[in-house]
């Protein structure tokens, strides 16, 4: 068990001192009640039953009933407050992990699987709640009862108590031996469970593709393979746990049997009374159950501590922070410039996606971007948004190097519409105002009309307040793209980035919407990656990108006459 991890967890406990004091008082009350019952049993037998003293018997029974009431009330407070503290702490940890995750650099998500993130924020954190309850409730209670029962056993019989003490090292040996193996298995089990969650997430996000290719049977087989892998780790871990539990039970009950045998001899010889041996056996049972509980908890601590370790790695991971950030100049005349920019994705280190790229875009320009697949078009936009950092060269907005500007400040100037419209499982309106939650109803209604959302939203039962399902499953591709564009326009950006943002619309609808966008964005910059050449024919100029660089630029007319690459791209689209 990693003490550093437990110390880290203990830091959260300081916020709940009052609750923990109640838990500790309740724990001590429970332990004291159970231990006191042993001495009452001795009096019940030696002073009551042995002497036929019914008054003493009644008094002992009354005391036992009183202790049971105290035990019950204390158990309620212990259970309620420790579980309440555990839930508060895990929610605090979950919030910290979520807050840190959502502020990671975009490139850091390339190393993470969505299923693994979900698993860590749900299953792993639930394991931490188990760790808190087990340690602060059961472990401490059992420890107090073990120490108390052993102490009281020495008062009853030093010889018999010494026999009980000998059994503790016997139980420690297998615990230490199996501990490291169980920890490794626990880590593998959690990783395997994350793969299961990833598979479930991937399956139901792509359910239409699975249906279209009749791949249900194959997916079930793949899922079963992952499930069996997870079960193998669980089975092995549970087998070791069961073996240790069996050894513990055998040692505990053999010890109690030995105590009864030796104790019976002492009674016959007059060294112990019947009440003392009953009281001693009671304490021995408590000691056995408590030690068994402690050892079982210790054997099971590896799973939640491994989960805690996985969560701590998320909380402690820090993104690259530049200490010399400056505010971005908020001038009316906006400009963008790339100077000899190079970029390579970490996942593809041998492929230079952007290669010595240079370009300049000034205010009041509608700029089209064309190029074959993999030429670097979308990467250009993502560098501008500071999703990634260029390796070499400089990217300027308003003549400022964006490497020295907070990414959040840069994105205040920009609205981005990807080809795959990102829609949240809420209402149409909530998806639109995601771009600007301070927009007035008038502004929202105007944007809805301009983007053509009004045409289909009025046919829905609740209009723009209609719930559209997870990822907008109840909408068509074109409808989702209109919502994504409305969200971007409501933001009132200085720079609008369209990455094949109208690919699901027909040519006529696309032109109508594009004309509306140009009116709204007058005086600012529109950069549009073309799905169809027709969508950028009216652009002020077009950048032709090939192999990560700008090879030529000009109007549609000029490029059609003078650029072989551009003509080939146009020709390829006509043949599709």
From Swiss-Prot:
Binding, ATP: 371-378
A Gene Ontology molecular function term of the record: ATP binding
Key word Signal present: no
InterPro entries with a match to the protein in the record: AAA+_ATPase (IPR003593), ABC1_TM_dom (IPR011527), ABC1_TM_sf (IPR036640), ABC_transporter-like_ATP-bd (IPR003439), ABC_transporter-like_CS (IPR017871), P-loop_NTPase (IPR027417), Type_1_exporter (IPR039421)
Membrane topology: Multi-pass membrane protein
GO CC annotation, single: plasma membrane
Keyword set includes Translocase: yes
ABC transporter domain residues: 336-572
Ranges annotated as spanning the membrane: 21-41, 61-81, 135-155, 158-178, 242-262, 277-297
Annotated S-S bridges: none
SMART domains: AAA
Record domain ABC transmembrane type-1: where: 20-303
Enzyme's top EC category: translocase
The entry's keywords: ATP-binding, Cell inner membrane, Cell membrane, Membrane, Nucleotide-binding, Translocase, Transmembrane, Transmembrane helix, Transport
EC id: 7.-.-.-
Localization terms from the record: Cell inner membrane
Domain notes: The ATP-binding domain (NBD) and the transmembrane domain (TMD) are fused.
Main function: Part of an ABC transporter complex. Transmembrane domains (TMD) form a pore in the inner membrane and the ATP-binding domain (NBD) is responsible for energy generation.
Family statement: Belongs to the ABC transporter superfamily.
Quaternary assembly: Homodimer.
Name this polypeptide is given: Putative export ATP-binding/permease protein RP696
Naturally occurring in which organism (per UniProt): Rickettsia prowazekii (strain Madrid E)
Species lineage: Bacteria, Pseudomonadati, Pseudomonadota, Alphaproteobacteria, Rickettsiales
């Amino acid at each position: 068990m990693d003490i550093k991890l437990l110390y880290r967890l203990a830091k959260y406990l300081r916020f709940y001192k009052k609750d923990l004091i109640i838990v500790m008082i309740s724990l001590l009350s429970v332990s004291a009640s159970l231990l006191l019952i042993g001495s009452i049993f001795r009096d019940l037998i030696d002073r009551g039953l042995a002497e036929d003293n019914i008054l003493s018997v009644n008094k002992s029974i009354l005391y036992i009933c009183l202790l049971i009431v105290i035990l019950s009330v204390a158990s309620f407070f212990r259970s309620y407050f420790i579980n309440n503290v555990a839930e508060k702490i895990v929610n605090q940890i979950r919030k910290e992990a979520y807050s840190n995750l959502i502020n990671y650099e975009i490139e850091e998500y390339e190393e993470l699987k969505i299923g693994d993130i979900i698993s860590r924020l749900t299953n792993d954190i639930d394991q931490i709640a188990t760790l808190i309850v087990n340690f602060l409730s059961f472990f401490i209670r059992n420890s107090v009862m073990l120490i108390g029962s052993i102490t009281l056993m020495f008062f009853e019989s030093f010889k018999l108590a010494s026999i009980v003490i000998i059994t503790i090292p016997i139980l420690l040996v297998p615990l230490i031996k199996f501990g490291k193996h169980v920890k490794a298995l626990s880590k593998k089990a959690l990783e395997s469970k994350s793969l299961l969650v990833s598979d479930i997430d991937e399956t139901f996000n792509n359910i239409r593709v699975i249906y279209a290719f009749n791949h249900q049977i194959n997916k079930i087989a793949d899922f079963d393979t992952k499930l069996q892998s997870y079960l193998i780790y669980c089975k092995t871990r549970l087998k070791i746990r069961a073996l240790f539990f069996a050894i513990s039970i055998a040692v505990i009950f053999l010890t109690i049997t030995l105590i009864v045998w030796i104790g019976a001899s002492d009674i016959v010889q007059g060294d112990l009374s019947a009440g003392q041996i009953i009281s001693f056996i009671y304490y021995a049972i408590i000691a056995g159950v408590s030690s068994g509980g402690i050892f079982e908890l210790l054997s099971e601590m590896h799973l939640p501590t491994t989960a805690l370790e996985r969560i701590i790695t998320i909380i402690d991971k820090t993104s690259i922070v530049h200490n010399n950030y400056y505010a971005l100049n908020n001038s009316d005349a906006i400009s963008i410039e790339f100077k000899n920019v190079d970029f390579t994705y970490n996942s593809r280190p041998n492929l230079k996606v952007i290669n010595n790229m240079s370009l300049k875009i000034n205010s009041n320009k509608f700029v089209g971007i064309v190029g074959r697949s993999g030429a670097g078009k979308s990467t250009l936009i993502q560098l501008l948004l500071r999703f990634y950092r260029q390796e070499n060269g400089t990217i300027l907005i308003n003549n400022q190097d964006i490497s020295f500007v907070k990414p959040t400040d840069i994105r205040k100037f920009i609205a981005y519409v990807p080809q795959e419209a990102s829609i949240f499982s809420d209402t149409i309106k909530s998806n639109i105002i995601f771009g600007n939650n301070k927009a007035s109803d008038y502004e929202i209604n105007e944007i809805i009309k301009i983007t053509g959302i009004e045409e289909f939203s009025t046919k829905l039962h609740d209009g723009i307040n209609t719930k559209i399902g997870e990822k907008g499953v109840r909408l068509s591709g074109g409808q989702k793209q209109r919502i994504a564009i409305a969200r971007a326009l409501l933001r009132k950006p200085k720079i609008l980035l369209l990455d094949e943002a109208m690919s699901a619309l027909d040519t006529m609808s696309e032109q109508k919407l594009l004309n509306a966008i140009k009116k709204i964005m007058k005086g600012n910059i529109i950069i549009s990656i073309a799905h169809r050449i027709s969508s950028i024919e009216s652009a002020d100029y077009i950048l032709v990108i090939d192999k990560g660089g700008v090879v030529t630029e000009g109007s549609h007319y000029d490029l059609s006459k003078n650029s072989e690459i551009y003509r080939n791209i146009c020709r390829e689209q006509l043949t599709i």
